[in-house]
UniProtKB/Swiss-Prot annotation:
InterPro entries: Ribosomal_uS2 (IPR001865), Ribosomal_uS2_bac/mit/plastid (IPR005706), Ribosomal_uS2_CS (IPR018130), Ribosomal_uS2_flav_dom_sf (IPR023591)
Gene: rpsB
Molecular function via GO: structural constituent of ribosome
Keywords: Ribonucleoprotein, Ribosomal protein
NCBIfam families according to UniProt: rpsB_bact (TIGR01011)
Organism: Xanthomonas campestris pv. campestris (strain ATCC 33913 / DSM 3586 / NCPPB 528 / LMG 568 / P 25)
SUPFAM superfamilies: Ribosomal protein S2 (SSF52313)
Pfam families membership: Ribosomal_S2
Biased composition (Low complexity): 264-275
Protein name: Small ribosomal subunit protein uS2
Amino acid sequence: MPQVTMRQMLEAGVHFGHQTRYWNPKLAPYIFGARGKIHIINLEKTVPLFNDAMNFLSSIAQKRGTVLFLGTKRSARESIKEEAERCNMPFMTQRWLGGTLTNFRTVKQSVARLKELEAAETDGTFEKLVKHEVLGLRREREKLDASLGGIKEMNRLPDAIFVIDIGHEDIAIKEAKKLGIPVIAVVDTNYDPALVDYAIPGNDDAIRAVQLYARAAADAVLEGKAAAPNSASVREEEFSAEAGDEGKGRRAPAKKATEKKADAPAAAPEAPAAE
């Protein structure tokens, strides 16, 4: 798991919240205090929640799942795109199109159109058309690429969504919640952490803070991918095990124990999600 220290968070300005008059009382447990009418986030509580979120992202990637990186606000676009591309995950950095998740079949049709236009531009089809037709098709391609280019290789719904600003991406979060897709998100002092599955209390505006979140998320995904079992080696092990069983022949069934085993102690309950 990527290690992000409290000092790194301080240097990136993760602890700076919004003005006190805009606060959401449900984030009160994660607020240290106020300075100059600005809420200060308690990083001692942010760090463990941040680590939990990164562990979850890593586990998704380890199972060969897909994480959609989402950041359409100006301060997040560059970092989200760069880090999503680094870990080879889909992303959206322009305006969220309503129904991207809940009407995914229609979105896939638009993506297919984008791929068709890209192929036509490279295979010489455009050269056979008149100039004004080519200009119209290129404008269509550019428009589709701006809105859907980051998800054109996403062939199914994502297994999780990583979000920078839950207020800015409220429509996407509602769609994910409706479909049961887990949401990992940075939550500033003016929002309710209960709206997402894995809340990271922190500054969602500062560019350096956004870079820190996106970089850590990409690192978590890459670590998860590296830890994923090799499908070829797994099949080879299964084949070897089956061959070994055939060579040994059937074993006699084990005799039942005369004494009952003591019940195993119940597993400790997981800590409840932060609200």
